[in-house]
Amino acid sequence: LLGVKGGRELFREVASGKIKTNNPTVNGAWAPVYLINKMLLGLSAAYTQCDLKEALPILVRLADWFGSQVLDKLTDEQIQQLLICEHGSINESYVEVYELTGQKRFLDWARRLNDRAMWVPLSEGKDVLFGWHANTQIPKFTGFHKYYMFTGDRAFLLAATNFWNIVKQNHTWVIGGNSTGEHFFSKKEFIDRMLHISGPET
């Protein structure tokens, strides 16, 4: 159920502190946290949108397993290292499980799954997006906003709001695209990027 071959062994390795990340791999496996995020989102939607009652206990057990068997074994710094790899909106997934269960441990895990490399500078209004993989960054900010909704921590509201305004004002063509090759770029590159084979994209 972990979405990647050898997933249980992979996460045992991660939980032991052996973490080698880039984008898009963790210890050589393609985006394993991203895959867990997609499973959590699917299970949540199956329960809330399709009234599939059986989905809720599976959702809770999967979120509990990843939280207790992986996240709880890691320091905050190690989790931030894990978040270098594309991970979707895993923070948002954990807020959703908290919303459905009322069990605070899921909100605590959501807090630890907020990527500091993005929410801290964006909460301060800094545009640090140049060169970053757009598809990796965008879902984090829906997660930051969801986290704000359930905690009232305005730093995350500011991060999400500033992200929207910065992307709209500094990274978007009039037709709506905001990246090429799924990556943000600097203002001075707009004309050249119009001719790029993999852009404009949104």
Predicted regions and their residues:
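Glycan-recognition and catalytic cores of secretory/periplasmic carbohydrate-active enzymes
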Residues: L1-T202
